[in-house]
Design a protein with these regions (language model features):
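Acyl-donor binding region in acyl/amide transferases
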Residues: 55, 65-68, 100-262
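A short helix-loop-beta-strand connector motif used in the catalytic cores of GNAT acetyltransferases and
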Residues: 73-82, 260-264, 273-278
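Short amphipathic alpha-helix that is part of the acyltransferase structural core
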Residues: 26-80, 84-96
Length: 301
């Protein structure tokens, strides 16, 4: 059982603005927001504010650390794509990313956040070195329903455009513990069934186990269905539970062609330190990126 304390007070606005001004401007949106790449720095006001807003946002969906800020040891060597509203002087959202090759050289596997939740086989290092880990994405509640998440993806696209050797995106994608158990079971079973990892490159340290009733019902449901038809069946099951597929699950899977092996879920586990959410470890092969997605986010010319 995890209790939650008070969330930290906001950082001084001008200190946050000045810290972000030292970052790399990746782009600007038509409605006046800036997309900034922030490097880690000790006691950075912008990073402290990101940690505060992460905790605030994740608690709204039944996740979070229970601490004053959601900051951990990985924030000290990861970078952050930040969406900044220069009119409201407000951090709108952020995405944490880590270039796995340099992190492995400096810290080994222990330097990757994913490794704290999943144990990688030695063979996984080959793809990890060509990858960027994504995670801890959020948009503050006041901007839900806006284009803010898409703006953050434009920032990821700008980041990848400057680093064309990047082959993979990977990282944990969460399902809230507030979601009904049956809904989580259906979601996990669908993604395991249609986007499996035949190489078994990672295993959850705290595996997620599907209940036997849904295990058999889901297996029967997908029989004879391709991924698209299976998705329609999944949506029907979730609708009965008043649940929708989480946005990031839809977004990652939709980046690539559905049956080309471009997206794999390596395993699913439970994170007791983050509200007992369920994490699916995803790997996206950018070599299978849909042309429309490449044109939208990377090849802007």
């Amino acid at each position: 059982f995890q209790t939650s304390g008070a969330i930290a007070h906001p950082e001084p606005v001008q200190a946050v603005r000045m810290a972000l001004a030292r970052g790399e401007l990746l782009g600007a949106t038509s409605d006046g927001k800036q997309i900034i790449l922030l490097d880690p720095a000790p006691e950075c006001p912008a990073l402290r504010e990101i940690g505060r807003l992460r905790e605030l946002t994740f608690r709204r969906v039944g996740e979070g650390t229970g601490g004053r800020r959601d900051l951990d040891r990985f924030d000290g060597h990861y970078r952050h794509i930040v969406l900044w509203d220069s009119e409201a002087l407000q951090v709108v959202g952020a995405y944490r990313l880590g270039e796995a090759g340099p992190i492995l050289d400096r810290f080994g596997l222990a330097g990757l956040y994913s490794h704290s939740l999943f144990e990688f086989r030695p063979e996984a290092v080959e793809f990890l070195r060509d990858g960027v880990e994504l995670g801890r994405s959020f948009v503050v509640p006041a901007y839900w329903g806006s284009r803010s998440l898409d703006y953050l993806w434009q920032g990821i696209g700008a980041y990848l455009r400057a680093r064309p050797a990047t082959r993979y995106l990977f990282g944990p994608v969460s399902l809230s513990a507030d979601m009904p158990t049956a809904a989580r079971d259906w979601l996990v079973h669908y993604h395991r069934h249609y986007y499996p990892d035949p190489d078994r490159l990672a295993r959850a340290r705290n595996p997620y186990r599907i209940g036997p009733d849904i295990e058999s019902a889901a297996a029967a449901t997908w029989q004879g269905l391709d991924a698209r038809a299976g998705l329609a069946a999944l949506k029907q099951q979730l609708a009965r539970l008043n649940v929708a597929i989480p946005v990031l699950y839809r977004q990652y899977v939709d980046l690539v062609e559905p049956e080309d092996g471009g997206v794999r879920f390596l395993d699913f586990g439970v994170d007791p330190s983050f509200g007992n959410c369920v994490d699916g470890l995803i790997r996206v092969d950018l070599g299978w990126l849909k042309p429309a997605k490449r044109a939208r986010y990377i090849d802007l010319d």
